[in-house]
Amino acid sequence: MVASNLTLQQRGWFDVLDDWLKRDRFVFVGWSGLLLFPTAYLAIGGWLTGTTFVTSWYTHGLASSYLEGANFLTAAVSTPADAMGHSLLLLWGPEAQGDFIRWCQLGGLWAFVALHGAFALIGFMLRQFELARLIGIRPYNAIAFSGPIAVFVSVFLIYPLGQSSWFFAPSFGVAAIFRFLLFLQGFHNWTLNPFHMMGVAGILGGALLSAIHGVTVENTLYQDGEQANTFKAFDSTQEEETYSMVTANRFWSQIFGIAFSNKRWLHFFMLFVPVMGLWTSSIGIIGLALNLRAYDFVSQEIRASEDPEFETFYTKNILLNEGLRAWLAPVDQPHENFVFPEEVLPRGNAL
């Protein structure tokens, strides 16, 4: 008894805190939780505050809050004014000077949500690393989650850092994200970018693989019985697999002429496809931050300009992009006071 008390007394505060953080509880905390929970709480709270009360009139000339009449699809926490450049927009910084209302008007909430959101995602990834380490499994969950982190950081942070200001990042809202997608298409021809193509293939391919895998397992479940390994429930200690890999292999071999014969390769492939899609999309967005162009089929553009009867889907899309730029820019960037003469504006076929 005395020895145990001495042991407890000799333990430092770090060991005591370590034990408390890693204690088995309903919601695991861990060291990663010290980063995750405060930053996630502040990011979500900042977003809810902004979408409820804060206008975008001073930054975008828009109404963007429930208080102004926006709904869930049109409300947003908008990016800071273009004049703010890449300032961190700290509440106590030279722009707001501690004035909370002025800070909100300048777009400080966006910087607040973006910064804390990025750290929250990193905290969630570290949480998966930490828990995997504690229970003795491999860290592929955390590695896979690097995909969403890469997309968030590239889209919300790296892209605007490559442009003139935070203004050109996406605002945090549904319709605001759609505006950003149209902007990427009109100004960067994003859909023709090979990294976007790889991203689409990865995400849709991952969804397809997930659906195929799910139905295959469902289709090859053992018939329920009363035996130890096939009773009407799942037992974490059962000796055999719950579904028949052999039957699944035979089925897909007949359908496609080829099938996975190894579970590890199958599941790694299901991990690899969507994560690579996210990574390649992120690389593409970094390219856009540097204003790198996608494919330019100049020969088709030259021929289309010389021959009125020659047009391809590519040349049609280029014209659509010109229309997007001409009509989007004056509305999207009202502070620039763009005025385009009528003769250079695109006209629809009906006109």
From Swiss-Prot:
Top-level EC class as recorded in UniProt: oxidoreductase
Q: Which residues bind pheophytin a?
A: 128, 141
Assigned keywords, A-Z: Chlorophyll, Chromophore, Electron transport, Host membrane, Host thylakoid, Iron, Magnesium, Membrane, Metal-binding, Oxidoreductase, Photosynthesis, Photosystem II, Transmembrane, Transmembrane helix, Transport
Q: Where in the cell is it found?
A: Host cellular thylakoid membrane
Q: Which residues cross the membrane?
A: 39-59, 123-139, 151-164, 206-226, 277-293
Chain sites annotated for binding chlorophyll a ChlzD2: 116
InterPro entries attached here? D1/D2, Photo_II_D1/D2_sf, Photo_RC_L/M, PSII_PsbD/D2
Q: Summarize where Fe cation binds, as residue positions.
A: 213, 267
Q: Enumerate the residues binding chlorophyll a PD2.
A: 196
Coiled-coil residues are none
Biological process according to GO: photosynthetic electron transport in photosystem II
The record lists a plastoquinone as bound by: 213, 260
What Pfam families does its record include? Photo_RC
Q: Does the keyword Manganese apply?
A: no
Q: Which GO terms describe its cellular component?
A: host thylakoid membrane; membrane
The family database entries (HAMAP family) matched by this protein are listed as: PSII_PsbD_D2
UniProt record similarity statement? Belongs to the reaction center PufL/M/PsbA/D family.
Assembly behavior: PSII is composed of 1 copy each of membrane proteins PsbA, PsbB, PsbC, PsbD, PsbE, PsbF, PsbH, PsbI, PsbJ, PsbK, PsbL, PsbM, PsbT, PsbX, PsbY, PsbZ, Psb30/Ycf12, peripheral proteins PsbO, CyanoQ (PsbQ), PsbU, PsbV and a large number of cofactors. It forms dimeric complexes.
Q: What is this protein called?
A: Photosystem II D2 protein
Q: From which source organism is this entry?
A: Synechococcus phage S-RSM2
